Amino acid sequence: MAKPQVFFDLQANGENLGRIVMELRADVVPKTAENFRALCTGEKGFGYKGSTFHRVIPGFMCQGGDFTRHNGTGGKSIYGEKFADENFTLKHTQPGILSMANAGVNTNGSQFFICTAVTSWLDGKHVVFGAVTQGLDIIKKVESYGSDSGKTSKKITIADCGQL
């Protein structure tokens, strides 16, 4: 099975930061990868375009994907509100890992995070479904606008996104 490539064009307070490219592991977690891919393209009538990274903690991760409430309490999947944890085969082994944010077991929606460090304590709790393949320097830039509380000093927006 193919591993789809998707992208985010990121901005900080309206200033272009650049593009990150991510490879989705549809070969391991097809349902989770398809959800993220379709939210990147917006083909279901909703998705990530125009949404923000609402929580950025340096040395940990950058979280986004709440395109309904924009504060970390919302979002929805292409399957309805929430969907089950597909599997925990892939691990949080390096910076750039793409994983699902959740509110407990089987509560995946649209929120995701990009690791900026090894986060092995999340293994078995969050579904890893891909990794950044280009633009880790852009993620480092985003990380620099974060804080220990997760509040960002600049508004980090997904200005455009899609599939390559």
Swiss-Prot record:
Q: What is this protein called?
A: Peptidyl-prolyl cis-trans isomerase
Known regulation of its activity is:
Binds cyclosporin A (CsA). CsA mediates some of its effects via an inhibitory action on PPIase.
According to its UniProt record, the EC number is 5.2.1.8
Family, per the entry? Belongs to the cyclophilin-type PPIase family. PPIase A subfamily.
What is the residue range of the signal peptide feature? Answer: none
- According to its UniProt record, this protein's enzyme class is isomerase
- Show the Gene3D superfamilies listed in the entry: Cyclophilin-like (2.40.100.10)
Q: Where is the PPIase cyclophilin-type domain?
A: 7-163
Say where the protein is mainly found.
Answer: cytoplasm
UniProt catalytic activity: [protein]-peptidylproline (omega=180) = [protein]-peptidylproline (omega=0)
Swiss-Prot/TrEMBL GO biological process terms = protein folding
Where is the protein localized? Cytoplasm
Q: Which UniProt keywords apply?
A: Cytoplasm, Isomerase, Rotamase
A single GO molecular function term of this UniProt record = cyclosporin A binding
Q: What does this protein do?
A: PPIases accelerate the folding of proteins. It catalyzes the cis-trans isomerization of proline imidic peptide bonds in oligopeptides.
